[in-house]
Amino acid sequence: ITAVKAVYYSATGNTEAVVTRIAKRIAERLGVSVESYDFTLPENRTQLQNFGPSELVVFGTPVYAGRVPNKMLPAVQTLFKGDGTLAVPVVTFGNRNFDNGLIELRNELEHNGFHTIAGAGVVCSHVFSDQIAPGRPDEEDWKILDDFADRAAEKAGSLTEIPAPIQVRGDDPVGPYYTPLGTDGKPAVFLKAKPLTKDGCLRSVRNLCQGLSHGLHKCRGSITGHRYLH
């Protein structure tokens, strides 16, 4: 391995923190360089990213409803190509369950020319509320992640043949996305939410905002009242 790449979609910064921590730790253990590629914003999802056989990619996304975010899945499927590249799929979740998110990401990476050698599902503070998994990852979580990265680095450095896909929890195949049902048992119909904010709040962070999730984290004083989803 000559380089480690941290690749991630991170609307609020949680996944970025986890993926870069793991990637940097692996790079330190292998004595190689580390680089990051953030495909959160649309302008970073326009060109094919190729990775070579001497690189290791730590690839992360959050889990939405137990899956890789459906709006990001096409980018994961088409924009990142490995050439026998080692990979570590990582998903973050808001303290309920990562369900099929990790195995789905593993399968997409394997399909795109990567060889997965380790995988992680990591609890992070929920994007909708600081009261759900507050402060996670905490100090103990980071210790566990550092140990995980050390073991991934050791495995990467000792491989003598192409590894089988890493075994992770989940259904394979993963099946269709979850469909919320209404009280009548039929698929629920959702209207687009338009947050009510103080003048200028969202405009002041529009270059940082990835939809409502990032807005919540950057503008809590203005858009988190009881009317923000009216």
What are these language model-derived features?
Residues 62, 69, 137, 195, ...:
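Proline-rich low-complexity regions
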Residues 2-6, 10-40, 47-188:
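FMN-binding flavodoxin-like domain, especially the glycine-rich phosphate-binding loop
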Residues 181-203:
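Charge-patterned, long linear interaction tracts outside catalytic cores
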Residues 197, 203-230:
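Iron-sulfur cluster-binding cysteine motifs and their immediate structural context
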